[in-house]
């Protein structure tokens, strides 16, 4: 067995394409689908607080709208500083209503009006919780705008006051402060770490209890997502350690919104590197995460697939933790899911398993997933085909001879060769790399493989790639032609024809790693 492993390790060195090694074979999400990198759900992107009808105060809608439209910003600013509590509250409320409008709220106009310091001062008015609530709401909506608008709120020294309001005896004030802090934290790693440094985590987590209203808990969970977001740099290790026990509780919640946000938080943490992946594993949450791959809600499935997909970009040992939770049993349904994005992410996951060790490659084969990958290589949308090409190519690097022979038996060559004409140079290179590996591994059977490549039109495509503008591609195409399709080949010698086995197929040279049933392709 040790000799076989040495041979396989040597083969890895010989067959890997330039720049392809075990580290780069496992591909993180940002290399795979750039547009999905942030993948903020709609409500995350639109950080603005929508205005429920019940939150519009005593005035009738008509009266309130009339007052807002007919009150100049100058008057609002002036009245917001009034000593008369009624006038002051109405002015702050008018500002909040302007900011709550669905169509182009005048955030910049309000910032320029000089109202920010006044609103921030209102946060200190413990004697007037209604004023605190309205001011916090207005500031929340200003912070929901552009990064510059969020920074304006931060620079007005609002954050320490929002943190103070987390201890308010009035729940609506607490909840509004949570929402405001979520918008500020979501602006980026600098704001996130600033708010963390002021001590947001403990009071935030203290809200998680059976008695908390569901809408409030949704807000708290959403802020936790923002705390876990961003990986340049990732959140402080101490913060992750504080948050993980709460995520271990929330992953059992029955509310779909809370569950989705909990799993997205895990996906962001596992996207930050192997150290963070290990922290998530050590929390014991993975056995509760994997079953969510078959959750009835697509939103939950999508988030879970991303989270486990990030974990298997880690080491073989970290990958094995996911496989030990019977993860592969969920993939027949994911590979045939009506949503193409789920197909694509599922194949991306599997491409990182086939980049693993030979036992992990065998697990994919034993789960009968290879024919499904090949089907998507042939019939999937281009994004999914690209992932399938990686999955196949990685298997030709990581797999044993019999495992690669199984690929051939499943008729991988025609759909693999079809991708040689796509415009994406990376895909072409991945396919050429895989074909080269297969041909080298075939040894005495290389001619048989060559015939399969030629019969499906692959040889003609490889010949054309010798003129490709990409240097790596034309060199690899030339090497394949030179080594395996040279016109100097001797005439076919009957004694060299591979022996036919049952079913009219052929066997690889049986000098190493021969399973009892023999090689077949």
UniProtKB/Swiss-Prot annotation:
GO molecular function term, any single one: nuclear localization sequence binding
Modification N-acetylalanine occurs at: 2
Pfam families tied to this protein: Arm, Arm_3, IBB
Keywords from the UniProt entry: Acetylation, Cytoplasm, Host-virus interaction, Nucleus, Phosphoprotein, Protein transport, Repeat, Transport
Annotated Gene Ontology cellular component terms: cytoplasm; cytosol; male germ cell nucleus; NLS-dependent protein nuclear import complex; nuclear membrane; nuclear pore; nucleoplasm; nucleus
ARM repeat segments: 66-106, 107-149, 150-194, 195-233, 234-278, 279-318, 319-360, 361-400, 401-443, 447-485
Domain of life: Eukaryota
SMART domains in the record: ARM
Cross-referenced InterPro entries: ARM-like, ARM-type_fold, Arm_3, Armadillo, Importin-a_IBB, Importin-a_IBB_sf, Importin_alpha
Compartment(s) where it occurs, according to its Swiss-Prot or TrEMBL record: Cytoplasm; Nucleus
Subunit structure: Forms a complex with importin subunit beta-1 (KPNB1). Interacts with SNAI1. Interacts with TALDO1 isoform 1. Interacts with CYB1.
Family: Belongs to the importin alpha family.
Domain note: Consists of an N-terminal hydrophilic region, a hydrophobic central region composed of 10 repeats, and a short hydrophilic C-terminus. The N-terminal hydrophilic region contains the importin beta binding domain (IBB domain), which is sufficient for binding importin beta and essential for nuclear protein import. The IBB domain is thought to act as an intrasteric autoregulatory sequence by interacting with the internal autoinhibitory NLS. Binding of KPNB1 probably overlaps the internal NLS and contributes to a high affinity for cytoplasmic NLS-containing cargo substrates. After dissociation of the importin/substrate complex in the nucleus the internal autohibitory NLS contributes to a low affinity for nuclear NLS-containing proteins.
Role description: Functions in nuclear protein import as an adapter protein for nuclear receptor KPNB1. Binds specifically and directly to substrates containing either a simple or bipartite NLS motif. Docking of the importin/substrate complex to the nuclear pore complex (NPC) is mediated by KPNB1 through binding to nucleoporin FxFG repeats and the complex is subsequently translocated through the pore by an energy requiring, Ran-dependent mechanism.
The protein's name in its UniProt record: Importin subunit alpha-3
């Amino acid at each position: 067995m040790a000799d076989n492993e040495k041979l396989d390790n040597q083969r890895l060195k010989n067959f890997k394409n330039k720049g392809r090694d075990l580290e780069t074979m496992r591909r993180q999400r940002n290399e795979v689908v750039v547009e999905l990198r942030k993948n903020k759900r709609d409500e995350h992107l639109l950080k603005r607080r929508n205005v429920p009808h019940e939150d519009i105060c005593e005035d009738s809608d008509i009266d309130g709208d009339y007052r807002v439209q007919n009150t100049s910003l100058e008057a609002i600013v002036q009245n917001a500083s009034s000593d008369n509590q009624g006038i002051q509250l109405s002015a702050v409320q008018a500002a909040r209503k302007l900011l709550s409008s669905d169509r182009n709220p005048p955030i910049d106009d309000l910032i320029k009006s000089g109202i920010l310091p006044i609103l921030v001062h209102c946060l200190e008015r413990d004697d007037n919780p209604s004023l605190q609530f309205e001011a916090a709401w207005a500031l929340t909506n200003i912070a929901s705008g552009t990064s510059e608008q969020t920074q304006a709120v931060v620079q007005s020294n609002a954050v320490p006051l929002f943190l103070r309001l987390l201890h308010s005896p009035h729940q609506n004030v607490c909840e509004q402060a949570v929402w405001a802090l979520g918008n500020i934290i979501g602006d980026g790693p600098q704001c996130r770490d600033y708010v963390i440094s002021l001590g947001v985590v403990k009071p935030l987590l203290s809200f998680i209890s059976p008695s908390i209203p569901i809408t409030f808990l949704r807000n708290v969970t959403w802020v936790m997502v923002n705390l876990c977001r961003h990986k340049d740099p990732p959140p402080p290790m101490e913060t992750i350690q504080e948050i993980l026990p709460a995520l271990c509780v929330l992953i059992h919640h029955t509310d779909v919104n809370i569950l989705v946000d909990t799993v997205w938080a895990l996906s962001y943490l596992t996207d930050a590197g192997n150290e963070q992946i290990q922290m998530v594993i050590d929390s014991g949450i993975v056995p509760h995460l994997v079953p969510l791959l078959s959750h009835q809600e697509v939103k939950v499935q999508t988030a879970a697939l991303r989270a486990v997909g990030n974990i298997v970009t880690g080491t073989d040992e970290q990958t094995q933790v996911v496989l030990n939770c019977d993860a592969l049993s969920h993939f027949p349904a994911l590979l045939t899911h009506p949503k193409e994005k789920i197909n694509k992410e599922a194949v991306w996951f599997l491409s990182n398993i086939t980049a693993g060790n030979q036992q992990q490659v065998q697990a994919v084969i034993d789960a009968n997933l290879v024919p499904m990958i090949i089907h998507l290589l042939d019939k999937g949308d281009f994004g999914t085909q690209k992932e399938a090409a990686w999955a196949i190519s990685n298997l030709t690097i990581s797999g044993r001879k019999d495992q690669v022979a199984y690929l051939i038996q499943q008729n991988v060559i025609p759909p693999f060769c079809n991708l040689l004409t796509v415009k994406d140079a990376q895909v072409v290179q991945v396919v050429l790399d895989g074909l080269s590996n297969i041909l080298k591994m075939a040894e005495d059977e290389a001619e048989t493989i060559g015939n399969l490549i030629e019969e499906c039109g692959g040889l003609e495509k490889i010949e054309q790639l010798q003129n490709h503008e990409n240097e790596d591609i034309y060199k690899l195409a030339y090497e394949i032609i030179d080594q395996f399709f040279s016109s100097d080949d001797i005439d076919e010698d009957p004694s060299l024809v591979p022996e036919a086995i049952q079913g009219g197929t052929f066997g690889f040279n049986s000098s190493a790693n021969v399973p009892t049933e023999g090689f077949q392709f």
